[in-house]
């Protein structure tokens, strides 16, 4: 695309324009124009969809859900995701795509998001659901099908259109997902432009422009993308960094704890931000916990093996992408740890004593490499976790394996976390599961601790405006003494 600049001939005889050489359109301008075309189609589709009744909205939700849940398509998406990104494994992605979407459908089933959604006669308040408009959904390579589907379904449930800005590695998987959604929309008589993605190849410039032109941004993925979302000038929800720690106290059932940690840490090769990165084990059960971890496939590295792995996993203080989302056996192979590779480990275990940039195993690893810390008692374990979160992962969540309910309350009151997950496989539980009450989501709000403006699991409420009608009610002015009496009794009036 080019722009032709015209100059007028400086002559008394003619003022006809003379064409000069065509000048190329700058990348930012081209991106803005391309994004504007996509947004215009999304706005037109959303304006029509905003007039739909609840049944039509729920049909759109079901269509998008079935597009990813239908077994043959689910497998295609999982296979494409692994082939394109090189992260995780097919079987676990199939399970994730299905269960996370099924759970979201459960959360949304029967919930009103069109028209009047609540009335309080005593307060004289009527609440009306209103769409936010066009949603820009920024999605990561770690979940290139499940996360986009979750955002699409939530957006549709609230009467919005959505435009995906996937990571470059995940864009082909997103395109395949959209083709499946559009096929279901055609069957249901719904406009395809309700769900779109940026034209490939997706660039940072185009993503930034989409954020600027949309009505709401929901960003999951790198902290760079989250920061860009929060500074784009458009209302935004972004998630915090993971670096989950799990405490094993003296009252824990060790075999159960080890089995759950292993299930969580190995699922999809630990590509989830909710998988455990560190285990903090109290002295009283440290050695038997090591035995329990060994029984479920954990292999403890020697000091020299740990040093070799560290040197290769981090280059210039940055986690090497070649290790992300790989199996433990593959990581051992990449690091040249032949003894470990021959054992076919499920997890690699490394003992650590420090926290911070000089101790990179104390941070998020996005791989089945688990860091072990030893604590003298529960109080020391809490202090250790606090130091981990001061370095990385504040606001996300903490895991506890314990028979002492007071310990869970203590963690909830003292640590900078939005979730305390008790006696569960952490990566399944944090984003909602069928055996806990948390909403199903793949985007975890981390509160102000994690630089976020919400601490919930990202869900349908974040995709909705609410208009409140207030009518007069009988006036009731409280007595000053009723509200300030206790204060006056303590300090005087």
Curated annotation (Swiss-Prot):
The terms under GO molecular function for this entry are:
oxidoreductase activity, acting on the aldehyde or oxo group of donors, NAD or NADP as acceptor
InterPro entries registered for this protein in UniProt: Ald_DH/histidinol_DH, Ald_DH_C, Ald_DH_N, Aldehyde_DH_dom
**Entry keyword set:** Cytoplasm, NADP, Oxidoreductase
Gene name of the record: sauS
Question: Phosphoprotein: present as a keyword of the record?
Answer: no
Instruction: Spell out the subcellular localization from the entry.
Output: Cytoplasm
Give the induction annotation. Answer: Induced by sulfoacetate.
The annotated active site, in chain numbering, is: 273
Listed GO CC annotations: cytoplasm
| Endpoints of the signal sequence | none
Q: Which reaction does it catalyse?
A: sulfoacetaldehyde + NADP(+) + CoA = sulfoacetyl-CoA + NADPH + H(+)
- Family of this protein: Belongs to the aldehyde dehydrogenase family.
Q: What pH dependence of activity is documented?
A: Optimum pH is 9.0.
Chain residue ranges for the region called Disordered:
1-21
Null phenotype? Mutants do not grow with sulfoacetate, but can use acetate, taurine, isethionate and sulfoacetaldehyde.
The species is Cupriavidus necator (strain ATCC 17699 / DSM 428 / KCTC 22496 / NCIMB 10442 / H16 / Stanier 337) (Ralstonia eutropha)
State the protein's purpose.
Involved in the degradation of sulfoacetate, a widespread natural product. Catalyzes the conversion of sulfoacetyl-CoA and NADPH to sulfoacetaldehyde, CoA and NADP(+). Specific for NADP(+) and sulfoacetaldehyde.
Q: Where is the composition biased (Basic residues)?
A: 1-10
* EC number(s) per entry: 1.2.1.81
Matching entries from Pfam families are given as: Aldedh (PF00171)
Kind of enzyme, top EC level? oxidoreductase
According to the record's subunit comment, the protein's assembly and interactions are:
Homodimer.
Q: Which SUPFAM superfamilies match?
A: ALDH-like
Q: What is this protein called?
A: Sulfoacetaldehyde dehydrogenase (acylating)
